[in-house]
Design a protein with these regions (language model features):
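Structural/interface elements that position substrates and couple domains in central-metabolism enzymes
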Residues: 1-410
Length: 410
């Protein structure tokens, strides 16, 4: 099948590459000509395990192409995915300017019947806006070309995105016709080996499903952090409590590890957007608001503990930060708790030694650019303060003991 993926960021590049691996002819489009030039040179703009190898292989096999020309990409395409960003607006709502700009361009350039798929995380009702935008442009061209808009939200985890795409838990498809459902199932069928994991529904429900999924996961994170804070007050072991509740099949162990709160490109943005969606429709989403408030406070819990132990003035103290990205296995520092912790410590005069196996360049060039008193080190053995929940595992605790033991002999 011939496919166009518009937007060559994280979602677009992973999706396009995985579709290409299954034998489809995929053209990834981006208005950033520099990014396209680099992709054509084999330079991948993001880090995701296994992605670079897969991109290069599919380019070599002539299944994956990159261009800045949408008209060129749409010539033979049956399906066009919109995978551009929906950044957070000043009021916390999702900014649809890029999605609607793409819709306008599709209406101006499409040359045959097309299924237009919203892959971006968008508020409920966006498909209607996309449809109206495309239709308006077609009317200006006096064109009666047929098209349909479909919602197909992504559920990719950074650090495991390729595996998530190639072996999905489910594929949610929101459409308004049997033709659209059939074409989408045809596209995704090669990803299923044993049984059908398609979940079909109306478009608005599909749009809502993405927000509901992320809100549930964020809620579990904030809940466990709240429990961990209470455990500390009453003298209970949060890890033992986690095991105790996680063994209940109704709860499970996923997303109940205490830490410094959630970050990344999705949860913070989507929680705010969902709260705004509710507000726009006259509903006060109290639980969602509480999830966000708990998370904001959790980012600075470790700073509060440091202040309690050493005082407000941290001049003369050096703190090691192990882990800059918002989670392991990625270089993504968007809304990473480490950013907030480091800035608060530096503001109080502290020196920082920071280590991350993937995200140091992101920190230097973007998220911590200009922040004073930071030394980026090349070895995890140079840092002791640990921010990520995975460092509190048995392996993490054992590792810390090794560091401390080694430090005594130095």
């Amino acid at each position: 099948m011939n496919i166009t993926v518009i937007g060559s960021g994280y979602v677009g590049l992973v999706s396009g590459t995985c579709f290409a691996k299954m034998g489809n002819k995929v053209t990834c489009v981006d208005i950033d000509s520099v990014k396209i030039e680099k992709l054509n040179q084999g330079i991948i703009p993001i880090f995701e395990p296994g992605l670079e190898t897969m991109v290069l292989k599919n380019v070599k096999n002539k299944n994956l192409f990159f261009t800045s020309e949408l008209n060129e990409a749409l010539q033979n395409s049956e399906i066009a995915f919109i995978a551009v960003g929906t950044p957070m607006g000043e009021d916390g709502s999702a900014d649809l300017q890029y999605v609607l700009a793409v819709a306008k361009s599709i209406g101006q350039t499409m040359q045959k019947r097309l299924i237009v798929v919203d892959k971006s995380t968008v508020p409920v009702g966006t498909a209607d806006q996309v449809k109206a935008t495309i239709q308006k442009e077609l009317e200006l061209r006096n064109s009666d070309l047929e098209f349909e808009v479909v919602s197909n939200p992504e559920f990719l985890k950074e650090g495991a995105a390729i595996d998530d795409f190639m072996k999905p838990d489910r594929v949610v498809i929101g459409a308004a016709s049997e033709f659209a459902f059939k074409k989408m199932k045809e596209l995704y069928s090669p990803f299923f080996r044993s049984y059908d994991r398609f979940i079909t529904m109306d478009i608005r429900s599909a749009e809502m499903t993405k927000y509901a999924a992320n809100a549930m996961l964020a809620t579990k994170i904030s809940f466990m952090n709240e429990m961990a804070n209470i455990c500390e007050k009453v003298g209970a072991d949060a890890n033992q409590v986690r095991i105790g509740i996680g063994s209940d099949k109704r709860i499970g162990y996923h997303f109940i590890y205490p830490g410094t709160g959630y970050g990344g490109s999705c949860f913070p943005k989507d929680i705010k957007a969902l709260r705004n969606i509710a507000k726009e429709h006259g509903y006060s989403a109290q639980l969602i608001t509480a999830v966000e408030e708990v998370n904001d406070a959790q980012k600075l819990v470790i700073v509060q503990k440091i202040i309690k132990r050493f005082g407000e003035d941290l001049t003369g103290f050096t703190f090691g930060i192990w882990g800059l990205a918002y989670k392991p296995g990625t270089d993504d520092m968007r809304e990473a708790p480490a950013i907030y912790v480091i800035k608060e410590l530096v503001k109080r005069g502290a020196q920082i030694k920071a280590y991350d196996p993937k995200a140091v360049n992101e920190a230097k060039e973007h998220y911590l650019k200009g922040v004073q008193n930071i030394t980026y080190v090349n070895s995890k053995y140079e840092v002791l303060k640990i921010l990520m929940h995975w460092c509190y595992s048995q392996n993490g605790k054992s590792f810390v003991r090794q560091i401390l033991k080694k430090s005594k002999h130095n």
